[in-house]
Amino acid sequence: DRSGLVAEYAGQTATKTNKLCDAAVGGVLFIDEAYSLIDDSGDDPYGREAIQCLLKRMEDDRENLAVILAGYSLEMEKMIRTNPGLHSRISSTIEFDDYLPADLGLIFENMCEQNQYQLPATARYRALLGFDELYRLRDRYFGNGRLVRNAFEDSVRRLADRVANVSRLTESLLTSLTEEDIAIPGLSDQQLDNLIQQPHELRIQCRGCERSVRL
């Protein structure tokens, strides 16, 4: 992001940007929220210096350095339009679709598994309904994987709060996320409770099966 390329004082940005490019030669330089390099006011000499330095390195090291600029679509388009040099040096543009609710649920399950937390069916169902609702209400700033990470971290904190006063702790208590632990950023517990009370149609696809079943 911007902090990795732009320095605090005049004359230091080029050095900082070049150092980052040097470290990435032979590989990939990934810059997230790349549009933050350009101030909306247009009066940002440090950001312009970073971009000019980056453009030069993209040209000079084009055989040994791949640069990926990432961010929200509209902001990225605006950034590219305001700098002809960027437009001419970007060889391809890829726009990723938002994760589907099932994908978000699977990411959540994988995070639980990787961190050795158990996720019972009731807790999994509550999380999936929450992701489905937020997907339905999503705008262009939809969090995708970041949303899931925040949900996982919030749920783990709830688990810790729930067992804080338990006198006899077991491994199962410390590592089992229950339905009441599930927290989905942007939805209250009452909203999640209401979702659970509503009828839902789910499509079940088992691994290795050729058919799916609707419930």
Predicted regions and their residues:
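Conserved P-loop NTPase "ATPase switch" module shared by AAA+ and STAND
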Residues: 1-2, 24-46
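Canonical AAA+ ATPase core
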Residues: 35-42, 51-97, 114-115
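Short cysteine-rich clusters marking metal-coordination/redox-active sites
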Residues: 204-209
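Conserved C-terminal helix/linker of AAA+ ATPases
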Residues: 73, 122-128, 145-146, 152-153, ...
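Short glycine-rich substrate-engagement loop in P-loop NTPases that contacts/grips substrate
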Residues: 1-24
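Cys/His-rich microdomains that often coordinate metals
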Residues: 213
